[in-house]
């Protein structure tokens, strides 16, 4: 009996050690994109009380240089990968840009803004003189007229909704809530594809985005997903 018990104790120790390693691995995975970004939870995401969109697919950064209006427009209009203005990527999808293979990553942010510096740094990618692409899907239960897209970014950014350019802000700037606001638009019933290109010169880089209702209050009543919901 004693010899059997002696075998069991090391086995239990090994199992406990494995459990601790698994928990540590899970914790590391949750923090894979820095202290404010995590892998998305299951199911659709609703905007918070202030209306900010917190779920995105982000492509690893592409080298780019220039923050003036003309430079940024030239950067974002350049062809980097197939269907860059129409693709709805999946987490883990890869694209080839020049000689580099870049990956799309799904993230949820814990804050109102998406910290691109944390994102890139955590992946060992450059944070200066780079271009980030971001995509999300806004799902509306009904048509929503008279709304506006309100964005902020560090540094410059250009934004598209359902393939149409809505708003851009330029220069070496800090992220300010509602720094750029689009004209009034209508969100379609069903999925609406929101796409952003953020260009950073150096230092910190992040962005935030929300929709404002006809009274310029945070829009509610929609969900955010990273795939078009099945009909």
Region annotations inferred by a language model:
Residues 140, 149-153, 198-200:
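Non-cytosolic beta-sheet module surface loops
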Residues 145-160, 194:
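Aromatic-lined ligand-binding clefts that engage carbohydrates, nucleic acids, or primary amines
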